[in-house]
Amino acid sequence: MRNINPTDTMAWQALVQHKAEHLSIPQLFAENEDRFATYNLSFEDQILVDYSKNAINQKTLTLLRQLAKECDVDGARQAMFSGEKINRTENRAVLHIALRNRANKAIFVDGKDVMPAVNAVLAKMKAFSEKVIKGDWKGYTGKAITDVINIGIGGSDLGPYMVTEALRPYKNHLNMHFVSNVDGTHIAEVLRKVNPETTLVLVASKTFTTQETMTNAFSAREWLLADAKDQSAVAKHFVALSTNSETVAKFGIDTENMFEFWDWVGGRYSLWSAIGLSIVLSIGFANFEQLLEGAYAMDKHFYHTADEQNIPLTLALVSIWNNNFLGAQTEAILPYDQYLHRFAAYFQQGNMESNGKYIGRDGKAVNYQTGPIIWGEPGTNGQHAFYQLIHQGTTLIPCDFIAPAQTHNPLSDHHNKLLSNFFAQTEALAFGKSKAQVELEFTQQGKSLDEVKDIVPFKVFTGNKPTNSILLKKVTPYSLGALIAMYEHKIFVQGVLFNIYSFDQWGVELGKQLANRILPELEDDQPVVSHDSSTNGLINQFKAWRE
């Protein structure tokens, strides 16, 4: 990947000048009544992306696409898909796309085709999951498995949890549970719900040394052995998603039940790998394959589709415009589908851990904003929580609204009411409500302007708030796979344009190092004086109060 500061490009300088035109969303619609036709993109018969409610015109898009060319997005894309080690700080390839390479085309890393290993793990996941789902896998008392606990953190938890929740309409009889937090409350509450005789535990840690994951795994093992009283029971109730066979075996897990993945799979892109075993156990391997198929279809779209019709590229460019030129520092992801209630949290990690960097690929601090803050909640809950600030606050918050046209639960008129809010919110954010409209409403209610003049300003909505509307035909394994891959590739493009390395996460390391230093200091009651006064004071108060 080339090292190109985006602010040095001709396109960036032209965009700075273009910003001074102060484009207005209502005005853009007034100038082109059929604006939607020009500013929407479709993916197969599955996803419609309407980006017309952004403050952009054809000049904006032309300049943004020129920025992508000057920053060599195409070259970076080819480098990723061909297995080049674009994660330079860790000297690794970035090949989550290989995990869903349904054409089985050879992809090489260090001269070795990775696809035979990928296919072998998939075959192993299929065979294992079918055994558990059919009831042929027995616990230590000979009973079939009824509950599965996935113990992981970060990508080993967020992705599988998000997908299993999103695809609950496709789940089988197995009950899925997810434990991530090292807070003992998390594992304790889950263990209270399950029977050790019929519970299978997946321990998801590449190194099998992750502090939070292994702390929870050892607690789960103690819980099992308190009931089984036989070390051999561990092998019947635990499997590993790991590459550290020696440590896995020491834990008591049969290495035949160890599912590997590779250093070219980043944690936040790992749900497509063995880390997705909990997904397979929840919805079955055939549905997991459809998830892979959907992602693969989006991979092909991203790789082959021209810039003008390329959905991930377009979304990334619009985001760059909103954040780097219009001054937004955040983006909200707002799914109008309860099954997608963890989607925003998943891409909070996906985006912020990827692009929350201040050092460019040249090793120097950047002089522009990089990754935005990502957050969100399902609609319509958010409307009664934080939409007030989006509509009338002083911070510009671009929003992605996501909704399915078809629901899995057609109860009464629930879905029409839900979607009426989905459509209304983007209209309200784009066009707002003027002072004249507010005054007219009061007049129609029989009130004089004199008696309402003091309240009128509070009911004005300025509008001109940018949104994307992402309409799915239905949330299925296939469409969800495509949707996830769409956001993955958007994040990739943004990282290329930001001139940063999107696939490392050094920012998580310092806190872990300091925690490892502090942990031994908590083992006695001696006052701590080795830190700054604030940290010393907090530790010493903790010691005074703990039981």
Swiss-Prot record:
Keywords: Cytoplasm, Gluconeogenesis, Glycolysis, Isomerase. Pfam families: PGI. CDD domains: SIS_PGI_1 (cd05015), SIS_PGI_2 (cd05016). GO terms for cellular component: cytosol. One of its GO terms (biological process) is glycolytic process. One of its GO terms (molecular function) is glucose-6-phosphate isomerase activity. Coiled coil: none annotated. It is an enzyme of class 5 (isomerase). The active site is at E353, H384, K512. Signal peptide: none annotated. Its EC number is 5.3.1.9. PROSITE patterns: P_GLUCOSE_ISOMERASE_1, P_GLUCOSE_ISOMERASE_2, P_GLUCOSE_ISOMERASE_3. Pathway: Carbohydrate biosynthesis; gluconeogenesis; Carbohydrate degradation; glycolysis; D-glyceraldehyde 3-phosphate and glycerone phosphate from D-glucose: step 2/4. It catalyses: alpha-D-glucose 6-phosphate = beta-D-fructose 6-phosphate. InterPro entries: G6P_Isomerase (IPR001672), G6P_Isomerase_C (IPR023096), Phosphoglucose_isomerase_CS (IPR018189), SIS_dom_sf (IPR046348), SIS_PGI_1 (IPR035476), SIS_PGI_2 (IPR035482). It is found in: Cytoplasm. Belongs to the GPI family. Catalyzes the reversible isomerization of glucose-6-phosphate to fructose-6-phosphate. NCBIfam families: PRK00179.1 (NF001211). This is Glucose-6-phosphate isomerase. It comes from Haemophilus ducreyi (strain 35000HP / ATCC 700724). The lineage of its organism: Bacteria, Pseudomonadati, Pseudomonadota, Gammaproteobacteria, Pasteurellales.
